[in-house]
Every structure is written in C-alpha cells, then in structure tokens.
C-alpha cells in the first residue's frame, strides 16, 4: 500500500536579519521551525539609496509570493542608513512594546506586509559625581534576547551577546530592563590590525586556549587594558610567548577586560547568545570567573522574530 507524502507545512513568517554587511532570511512555520534559509552578502551598506525594495524582491520575492502572511525584519535595516528608520524603543521593553513600535513599510511592489523591528535604548544607571546619564542602544540584538527568553524559558537574568559591540542585558519579568555595550570586538580589531601590536600578531594563527586563558587572567589583575595590551608587544620582544599565540592572548585581554568591568560574582548564571567561535571564547573566559553558562546560537534570531510575530495584529496593515 502506497502512503501519500505528508503535505508541506505552510510558512507563517518570512524572518529577515538585515545587518550592515549581510542579509539572512528564513521561512518559519507556525511553530517557529525553519523550513528554508538563505543568506546574501547584501548588507545595508551595499544597497543604493531607494534600492531596498528591489534587493528584497530579488532575494526573497519568490518566498513572499507563496502566501506567507507576514515579513519581519530585524537589524540595521531599521537604522537611519537602512530601509526605513524604526526609532529605538525605550527600556524597560518586552514583546508588546516592540510590537507596538514596528515600522511598517509602504511600497507598491511588496507582495506581503513588511515591518521592521525597532532597536532598544536605555540610560546608564551609574552616574558618578552627579554626571549626567549616557544613552546606550542596540539594534538587532533585542530580537536575539527575546528569542533566547522564548528558547530557554528564562524570564529573569543576565543575557550576554558577544560581538563587535558586545551587549550585557538585564532581563526582568520577560522585559529588557537595562543593558551595557562594550566595544570589545572592535578594540581587538583595532589593536591587532592598526596598532603597534599588528607587527607581532599573526592574523591567521589558530586559537590557543592556554594563551587566551593567560590573557583573561592578566586582565583580572586590575592593571587595565591600556597597560596590559602593551605587554603583548613585550612578550613578543623578549620571546616569552610564541608569535602564533599572541592573537589569542590579546583576545583574552580584551574579553577579560569586559568581564572585569562587569564585576562578576562566582556562580553567576548567564545566557550566552552568539556565533560558535565567540560563544566558545566567552565560555572559556567566563568559566575562569566561576560563571555558569547556557549557550545559544543563530537560532535565537529566528526564535525571537517568531515570538514577536505572535504579538502582532498585522491584518490592519494588509
């Protein structure tokens, strides 16, 4: 007896992560499972003025015309340089707050309703000596945080998103209450490629866990990155560290400096969201501080957009 194949699950959401240098998309079913994925080197910096709708149609137009009811876009597509500015949503913010501040795109060529997710903004809490607060922002990471909340079921705690600009977010009752940004990845790139240290560092050297751990430990000494970074040069100068290990040592220094600034307590529980390479390094560093880690990867973005879609009444925008 022949059994008919199961019908294909219909897509319920076209989810896009449109960043500075890349464009990723996924078709999700009603449960948030990924039906198909695509990626292009078409970040917002590659799109000419007025060209976003054309790039969208060339990249995902066939998906948009299959009957999927909604497209949600996170990332830099909502910046001033993007498709349409989606102003930052103030913290504390949860799913409903983001859903209420979506930027809906009006364009005759679009086959389905398209909305851009706003980023988040907050004000620094610690004002020493009466200094005014300093604003902080994120755009794209908020979706990863809410995806991690949905994926882990944790509605309270600290969520860490390593990257060029790492984010540490405090989540309370399922809402982002406060966060801090650290320019860790950017500082590593500047020091390793455009400073005195670039003469010593081998950019393509393999990861050295021992050298990385030594850098994290040195950062904990409290001397500060401005002093410790110069040690990368002198360790090479006096041949106390092999050249292939220097990049890992410097990586440990800058990540360790980020952790030192957070004053982590032993046993701290953190949710870590990011690429496998960065999650591995931060896990190594955080273990030296006695932290306990729950890690997630790229699936957090799709989980966040799917969860956000459940809070949207998009029929008013069709």
Task: Specify the residue positions occupied by each region the protein language model found.
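Glycine-rich phosphate-binding/hydrolytic loop that grips phosphoryl groups
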Residues: 294-318
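Glycine-rich phosphate-binding loops at beta-strand->alpha-helix junctions
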Residues: 22, 267-285
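Short beta-strand-loop/turn "lid" adjacent to the catalytic site in phosphate-handling enzymes
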Residues: 63-135, 173
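Short glycine-aspartate micro-motif
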Residues: 13-17, 70-74, 157-161, 271
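Short glycine-rich, Thr/Ser-proximal phosphate-binding strand/loop in the N-terminal lobe
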Residues: 12-51
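Phosphate/pyrophosphate-binding loops at sites that engage ATP/ADP/AMP, CoA/4′-phosphopantetheine
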Residues: 58-70, 259-267
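Glycine-rich phosphate-binding loop plus the immediately following alpha-helix
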Residues: 47, 121-218
């Amino acid at each position: 007896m022949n059994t008919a194949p199961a019908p294909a699950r219909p897509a319920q959401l076209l989810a896009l992560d449109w960043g500075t240098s890349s464009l990723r998309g996924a078709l999700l079913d009603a449960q948030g499972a990924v039906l198909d994925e695509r990626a292009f080197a078409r970040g917002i910096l590659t799109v000419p003025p007025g060209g976003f709708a054309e790039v969208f149609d060339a990249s995902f137009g066939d998906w948009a015309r299959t009957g999927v009811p909604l497209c949600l876009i996170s990332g830099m597509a909502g910046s001033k340089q993007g498709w349409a500015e989606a102003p930052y949503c103030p913290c504390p913010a949860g799913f409903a707050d983001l859903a209420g501040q979506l930027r809906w795109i009006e364009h005759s060529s679009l086959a389905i309703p398209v909305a851009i997710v706003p980023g988040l903004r907050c004000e620094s809490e610690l004002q020493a000596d009466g200094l005014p607060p300093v604003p902080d922002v994120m755009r794209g990471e908020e979706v990863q945080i809410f995806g991690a909340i949905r994926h882990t079921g944790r509605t309270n705690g600290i969520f860490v998103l390593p990257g060029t600009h790492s984010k540490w977010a405090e989540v309370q009752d399922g809402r982002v209450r406060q966060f801090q940004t650290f320019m860790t990845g950017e500082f590593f790139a500047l020091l390793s490629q455009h400073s005195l240290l670039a003469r010593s560092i081998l950019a393509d050297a393999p990861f050295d866990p021992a050298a990385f751990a030594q850098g994290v430990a040195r950062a904990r000494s409290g001397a500060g990155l401005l002093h410790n970074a110069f040690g990368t040069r002198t360790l090479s100068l006096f041949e106390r560290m092999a050249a292939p290990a220097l990049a890992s040592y410097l990586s440990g220094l800058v990540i360790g400096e980020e952790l030192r600034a957070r004053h982590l307590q032993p046993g701290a529980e953190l949710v870590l969201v990011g690429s496998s390479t960065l999650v591995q390094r931060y896990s190594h560093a955080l273990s030296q501080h006695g932290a306990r880690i729950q890690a997630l990867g790229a699936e957090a973005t799709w989980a966040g957009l799917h969860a956000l879609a459940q809070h949207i009444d998009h029929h008013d925008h069709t």
